[in-house]
C-alpha cells in the first residue's frame, strides 16, 4: 500500500484540540509526548473495559509491548511512534513491516513525527489498510453517538445519521418538456432516501436512465452488423443550426399536502459513494428520467429535453417546480426538507447527465462529480467522419441504446399503450443517425454539451481512465478545456478502463469528495481545495501526482517514422475476416503482435518523456481508391510490469460506508507483467481529413498530407522504453468492417509523430 492523501486539511492548533476533545481525546498541549500518546490510545480503545489488554497486544519495538513501554521510563521516539501508528492503521508489525522508517518511506506515509497532537490528529484522518480513515473506523464502532445531527472532523461530515431509520419516499416531478407530444408535461419519478433531521439537508442526485431497469432483449435485437463497405461521400460543407429547446408550462392546480404518499421499497442498485454520504447527512436521490419505468414520455437519449427533465428535479428541490404524489397530478408535495444544494454523481451515462446538467447553469447545482461522462454524443458513436462503436460493444448505436433505456416497455400496460408510438419515434431517430456516412449533423449537434459549457457555474470534479475506450478520454479532455476559466475544476485521471475508483486503496477519493461537499453543500468554511489534475503514475503501483493541467504543453518531442514507403492492405482472406469479426479480441492480440494488415514502427525512447495531451500524426498518405479508413494505435512495447485496466479485489467487504452499512470491496489496479500497453489510439475517415464539418474527395493514388490527432492522455516514458506505432485500416472492435480490395500507402520519410511533453 502507498498513501496518497489529498483530503487532509491543515487546521490551527486550537481547532485540532477542540475537535479531538469533542471525540473524547482530551489531550493537553503541555503534556509530554509519551503521556499524550497513552491518553490518546486509551480513548482509542474505547470498546474495551480494560484498555491494558489492547495496549499489551501492540508492540513498541521488537522486544517491548506497548503496555510495558508505557510502564517504563523509556522515552517516546519517532521509531516507536511510527511503529504504533502503522499498527493502528491495520498493519501487522513483523509481518507487514519490520523497520518502521523503511516502511514509512516505502508507503509514502504522510505524517512526519514532530508535534504529537497534530500527528495524532492527522493519523485519525489517514486511511487504514482496509480502506476507511481511522476516524471513520472509530465512528463506525460507536466513538460518538448516532444522534441524527451533523458532526465534523477535519472539514468532513461524520457518519452520525442513522442509515436504518431513514425516510424512503417517491415523488413525481412535473417536468417542463413534453417529449411524446401528448399535451402534458412529462412526469419523472424520483426515488428518495434521506436521513431524519429537524432542519434542511443537501442532496446527492444520481441521474441514471438505467436505474429503473433496462430492456436488454430489445437492445440486443437493435444491434447492427459492423460488416459493410465504407461509404464514398459526396464532397460538401456541413451546415448546422443553433439547437432549440421547446419548454411547456405547468397545467392545472394540485392540492398541497405535507408528505409524499408513496413509500420507496427496494431499489435496483445504489451507488456506493451515495451510500457513504447518506449517514453523513446527505439525501440520496435516484432519477431515471423521461421514457423510463414509472415515468412518462419518450427516451430522447442525450438531448436537452432529457437534461431539462433532470434539471427540473433540482428546480423542485429549490421550490421552482412541482412534484406530485402520483400520476393523477391531484396532490403535490414540496421538498421542504431540502436546503436547495445539490451534487450529482455517477459513471458513464450517469456522468454524462452530470455534464449535461452542469451546462444548464441551474441554480442549486453546486458540484458535479462526472465520472467517465460523455461531452458530445457524436464522439461516442462516431469519430472523425466514421461510424464507430464504443469499445467493447461492436454494433451498438443510438437506437439500440434507446431500446435499452426505454424501460417503460418493461411494464406490460405501458407496452400495450405506448410501444407503437415508441417504435415510430425510434424510426425517426434511425433516420437522423445517418449510419451511412458517419458525418456530424444536427442530430449530434443537439447532443453536444460543449456548446453550452460556458454556462457552467458548479464546481466540477471529473474522473476518467486512460484505458477507457468506451467513453474515450477525448470527452473529458474537451469538457475540461471548454469550461469557463473562473470555475474550479478538477480531474482524477487514472490508468483504468471504464470503472469507478471510489473504493481504491491508494487514494482518498471518498474523503476528498466529503471535504468538498461538506464545504459546498453544508457551508463549512475551510480552505480545502483539490489540485487541478490528480494523475495516477503509470510507471509504479499506487502512485498519484498533482499536475497543473491536462494538455496545454508548450514543448513537443518529434519522432521520424522512417525512410521508405509502406502499404497497408485493407482486404483480408475470408477466413481471417470472419475469424476477427467473431472475436475482436483475437484481432487486437494479433495486431499487437504484428500479424494483421498493418504498418508497424518501433520508436526507441532516448530520454525520459512525460506525454500530456494529444499525440499528433503528420502523415503523407494516399489511397488506391476514392475512399480510405485509417486507424492508429500507439503502444508502449516490451515485456514489463504495467498497470492493468480493471481493478482487482484486495479485501472483500472491508470498507464500511457508515456504521456496518453497505460494506464494499477494497480494490486496486494490479501491476503485472504484459507484452505491451496501449498509450493512445484514433480513427479517421480520410474524406474528413482536414475538418469534421468538411467532406472532401479522395483521388486515387494522389498524395494527401494529413494531420491526425489521437486520443488525449497523460503517460510517462523512460529512457530505454520502446514506442510501437501501428497503422492499419479496419479495427474489428471499433470501426465498420470493410473488406474491399484497396490499400493505403504511407510515405514514412515525409511523416512524423509529435508528442506534447
Curated annotation (Swiss-Prot):
Cellular localization per UniProt: Cytoplasm
Molecular function GO terms recorded: aminopeptidase activity; dipeptidyl-peptidase activity; serine-type peptidase activity
EC number per UniProt: 3.4.14.11
Catalytic activity: Hydrolyzes Xaa-Pro-|- bonds to release unblocked, N-terminal dipeptides from substrates including Ala-Pro-|-p-nitroanilide and (sequentially) Tyr-Pro-|-Phe-Pro-|-Gly-Pro-|-Ile
Classification via Pfam families: Peptidase_S15 (PF02129), PepX_C (PF08530), PepX_N (PF09168)
Active site: 348, 468, 498
A single Gene Ontology CC term: cytoplasm
Transmembrane segments: none
GO BP annotation list: proteolysis
Keywords (A to Z) from UniProt: Aminopeptidase, Cytoplasm, Hydrolase, Protease, Serine protease
Primary role: Removes N-terminal dipeptides sequentially from polypeptides having unsubstituted N-termini provided that the penultimate residue is proline.
UniProt cross-references to HAMAP family, sorted A to Z: Aminopeptidase_S15 (MF_00698)
Quaternary context: Homodimer.
Family: Belongs to the peptidase S15 family.
The name this protein goes by in its record: Xaa-Pro dipeptidyl-peptidase
Source organism phylogeny: Bacteria, Bacillati, Bacillota, Bacilli, Lactobacillales
Amino acid at each position: 500500500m502507498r498513501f496518497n492523501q489529498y483530503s487532509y486539511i491543515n487546521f490551527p492548533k486550537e481547532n485540532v484540540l477542540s475537535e479531538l476533545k469533542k471525540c473524547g481525546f482530551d489531550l493537553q498541549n503541555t503534556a509530554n509526548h509519551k503521556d499524550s500518546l497513552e491518553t490518546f490510545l486509551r480513548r482509542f480503545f474505547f470498546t474495551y473495559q480494560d484498555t491494558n489488554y489492547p495496549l499489551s497486544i501492540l508492540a513498541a519495538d521488537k522486544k517491548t509491548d506497548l503496555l510495558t513501554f508505557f510502564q517504563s521510563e523509556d522515552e517516546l521516539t519517532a521509531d516507536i511512534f511510527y511503529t504504533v501508528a502503522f499498527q493502528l492503521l491495520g498493519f501487522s508489525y513483523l509481518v507487514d513491516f519490520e523497520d518502521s522508517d523503511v516502511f514509512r518511506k516505502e508507503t509514502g506515509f504522510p505524517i512526519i513525527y514532530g508535534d504529537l497532537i497534530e500527528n495524532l490528529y492527522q493519523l485519525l484522518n489517514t486511511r487504514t489498510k482496509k480502506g476507511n480513515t481511522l476516524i471513520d473506523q472509530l465512528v463506525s464502532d460507536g466513538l460518538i453517538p448516532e444522534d441524527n445531527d451533523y458532526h465534523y472532523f477535519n472539514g468532513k461530515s461524520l457518519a452520525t445519521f442513522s442509515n436504518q431509520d431513514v425516510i424512503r419516499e417517491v415523488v413525481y416531478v412535473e417536468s417542463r418538456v413534453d417529449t411524446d407530444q401528448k399535451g402534458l408535461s412529462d412526469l419523472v419519478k424520483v426515488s428518495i432516501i434521506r436521513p431524519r433531521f429537524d432542519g434542511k439537508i443537501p442532496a446527492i442526485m444520481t441521474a441514471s436512465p438505467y436505474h429503473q431497469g433496462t430492456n436488454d432483449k430489445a437492445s440486443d435485437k437493435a444491434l447492427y452488423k459492423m460488416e459493410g463497405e465504407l461509404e464514398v461521400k459526396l464532397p460538401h460543407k456541413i451546415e448546422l443550426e443553433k439547437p432549440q429547446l421547446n419548454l411547456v408550462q405547468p397545467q392545472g392546480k394540485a392540492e398541497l399536502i405535507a408528505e409524499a404518499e408513496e413509500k420507496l421499497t427496494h431499489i435496483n442498485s445504489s451507488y456506493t459513494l451515495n451510500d457513504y454520504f447518506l449517514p453523513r447527512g446527505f439525501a440520496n436521490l435516484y432519477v431515471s428520467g423521461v421514457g423510463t419505468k414509472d415515468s412518462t414520455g419518450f427516451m430522447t437519449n442525450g438531448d436537452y429535453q432529457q437534461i431539462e427533465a433532470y434539471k427540473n428535479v433540482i428546480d423542485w428541490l429549490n421550490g421552482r417546480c412541482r412534484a406530485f404524489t402520483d400520476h393523477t397530478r391531484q396532490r403535490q408535495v414540496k421538498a421542504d426538507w431540502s436546503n436547495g444544494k445539490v451534487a450529482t454523481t455517477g459513471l458513464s451515462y450517469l456522468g454524462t447527465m452530470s455534464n449535461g446538467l452542469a451546462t444548464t447553469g441551474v441554480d442549486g447545482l453546486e458540484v458535479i462529480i462526472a465520472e467517465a461522462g460523455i461531452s458530445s454524443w457524436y464522439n461516442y458513436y462516431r469519430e472523425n467522419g466514421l461510424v464507430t462503436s464504443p469499445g467493447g460493444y461492436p454494433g451498438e448505436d443510438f437506437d439500440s441504446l434507446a431500446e435499452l433505456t426505454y424501460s417503460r416497455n418493461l411494464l406490460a400496460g405501458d407496452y400495450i399503450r405506448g410501444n407503437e408510438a415508441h417504435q415510430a419515434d425510434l424510426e425517426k431517430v434511425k433516420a437522423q443517425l445517418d449510419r451511412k456516412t458517419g458525418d456530424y449533423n444536427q442530430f449530434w449537434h443537439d447532443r453536444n454539451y460543449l456548446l453550452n459549457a460556458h454556462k457552467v457555474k458548479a464546481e466540477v470534479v471529473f474522473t476518467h481512465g486512460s484505458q477507457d475506450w468506451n467513453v474515450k478520454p477525448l470527452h473529458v479532455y474537451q469538457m475540461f478545456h471548454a469550461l469557463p476559466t473562473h470555475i474550479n475544476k478538477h480531474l482524477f485521471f487514472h490508468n483504468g478502463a471504464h470503472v469507478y475508483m471510489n473504493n481504491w486503496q491508494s487514494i482518498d477519493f471518498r474523503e476528498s469528495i466529503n471535504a468538498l461537499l461538506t464545504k459546498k453543500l453544508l457551508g463549512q468554511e475551510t480552505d480545502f481545495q483539490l489540485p487541478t489534475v490528480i494523475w495516477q503514475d503509470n510507471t509504479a503501483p499506487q502512485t498519484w501526482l498533482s499536475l497543473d493541467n491536462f494538455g496545454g504543453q508548450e514543448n513537443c518531442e518529434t519522432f521520424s517514422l522512417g525512410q521508405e514507403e509502406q502499404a497497408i492492405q485493407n482486404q483480408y482472406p475470408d477466413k481471417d475476416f470472419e475469424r476477427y469479426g467473431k472475436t475482436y479480441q483475437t484481432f487486437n492480440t494479433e495486431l499487437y503482435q504484428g500479424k494483421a494488415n498493418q504498418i508497424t514502427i518501433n520508436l526507441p525512447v532516448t530520454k525520459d518523456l512525460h506525454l500530456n495531451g494529444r499525440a499528433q500524426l503528420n502523415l503523407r498518405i494516399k489511397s488506391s481508391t476514392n475512399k480510405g479508413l485509417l486507424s492508429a494505435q500507439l503502444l508502449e512495447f516490451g515485456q514489463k510490469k504495467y498497470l492493468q485496466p480493471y481493478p482487482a479485489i484486495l479485501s472483500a467487504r472491508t470498507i464500511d460506508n457508515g456504521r456496518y452499512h453497505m460494506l464494499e470491496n477494497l480494490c486496486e489496479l494490479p501491476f503485472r507483467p504484459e507484452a505491451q500497453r496501449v498509450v493512445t489510439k484514433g480513427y479517421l475517415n480520410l474524406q474528413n481529413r482536414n475538418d469534421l464539418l468538411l467532406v472532401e474527395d479522395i483521388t486515387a493514388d494522389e498524395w494527401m498530407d494529413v494531420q491526425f490527432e489521437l486520443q488525449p492522455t497523460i503517460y510517462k516514458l523512460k529512457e530505454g522504453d520502446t514506442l510501437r506505432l501501428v497503422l492499419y485500416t479496419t479495427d474489428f472492435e471499433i470501426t465498420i468492417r470493410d473488406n474491399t480490395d484497396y490499400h493505403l500507402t504511407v510515405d514514412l520519410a515525409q511523416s512524423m509523430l509529435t508528442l506534447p511533453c
